Amino acid sequence: MRVLVLGSGVIGTTSAYYLARAGFQVTVVDRQPAAAMETSFANAGQVSPGYASPWAAPGVPLKAIKWLLQRHAPLAIKATADIDQYLWMAQMLRNCTASRYTVNKERMVRLSEYSRDCLDELRLETGIAYEGRSLGTTQLFRTQAQLDNAAKDIAVLEQSGVPYELLDRDGIARVEPALAGVTGILSGALRLPNDQTGDCQLFTTRLAEMAVELGVEFRYGQNIERLDHAGDRINGVWIDGKLETADRYVLALGSYSPQLLKPLGIKAPVYPLKGYSLTVPITNPAMAPTSTILDETYKVAITRFDNRIRVGGMAEIAGFDLSLNPRRRETLEMIVGDLYPQGGDLTQASFWTGLRPTTPDGTPIVGATPFRNLFLNTGHGTLGWTMACGSGRLLADLIARKTPRISAEGLDISRYGNTQENAQHVNPAPAHQ
């Protein structure tokens, strides 16, 4: 059975790999010249199942108002003429309740924990190397209020059976010795010892090579224009003016997925949240992070690779704008300079931005659609690297009609209710150009 996977980021590539392992004949198509050239290229580098949390949380609407007035805020909103931006924001606000937060976080942690286990198995089976570390993640709280507010997250961790440790200042210095000199600005920390780190782009590139060995064909530099459909089936995909056919189709185009789905009458609430990262060469390994640090105040992750520090975070609701905002670089430099002033050379840092495909409830969209042979794997937000292996394995099981190892409840697009309009009344338009 032939499967056409659209997108070669970490989500598309893991989908292709697990589909090939399940015996499918797989082709991957992407407009870029290689795998992991967009959102997967320079993300924060953390595999953090326990910190899988939706942006839509109680208290966020009030915090957002304050953030808009701050210079170094974790969230910024740039008004556009795109009506989808405002519809998405309205949906997100509806998810900022305690009850919705609990449901959404459970779904995210469920998939993330499974994904971490799949990554462990993959590494054991293949020996894939990607500058990975298995030394946990430490979330830093600069205020007592932040530490107190962690109670709701800890409750979900306990419900999901995720190990954790609350740290005082001495505990922080024990797990991250380079922070010993700055613990005075911290109130405490939450550590998840089972979390991991690694270079997502390096992982994706090497997994693509392994997928090729399994028979997967990667076709780069090709423009995906639109899906051709009739009734409840996809007939093919228009690629560079030619109709390409398969038995099953997987849409893993991140923030661009809705553009291909809209002509089918499918409303997928996936919108880009623009993020930024700095990659800093390490000059003093003893003064650099041991693993991953999360700064709760600024919503920024600081991750240790072999000889580099990756500082990633921020969220701009700004449509598909990929311009580099110097103020965001200033913020990232300020944070890493605050915590690890002697760890790396900021003058040699590389600055990057990417679009995180985010759903209003934080949970990705993985699974079937109203079209019998079309499947989605998109909307992972800031957790594409964390959720990639589990999402790819889950999707392959669903397409193969095998019982997945975890519950897929609440993960497919049906959770949004009536997502399909009458497709025949929607004019097809080229996408992903």
Swiss-Prot record:
One of its GO terms (biological process) is D-alanine catabolic process. It catalyses: a D-alpha-amino acid + A + H2O = a 2-oxocarboxylate + AH2 + NH4(+). Pathway: Amino-acid degradation; D-alanine degradation; NH(3) and pyruvate from D-alanine: step 1/1. Pfam families: DAO. FAD binds at residues 3-17. Its EC number is 1.4.99.-. GO terms for molecular function: D-amino-acid dehydrogenase activity. InterPro entries: DadA (IPR023080), FAD-dep_OxRdtase (IPR006076), FAD/NAD-bd_sf (IPR036188). Keywords: FAD, Flavoprotein, Oxidoreductase. Its cofactor is FAD. Disulfide bonds: none annotated. One of its GO terms (cellular component) is plasma membrane. It comes from the Bacteria. NCBIfam families: PRK00711.1 (NF001933). Oxidative deamination of D-amino acids. Belongs to the DadA oxidoreductase family. This is D-amino acid dehydrogenase. It comes from Pseudomonas savastanoi pv. phaseolicola (strain 1448A / Race 6) (Pseudomonas syringae pv. phaseolicola (strain 1448A / Race 6)). The gene is dadA.
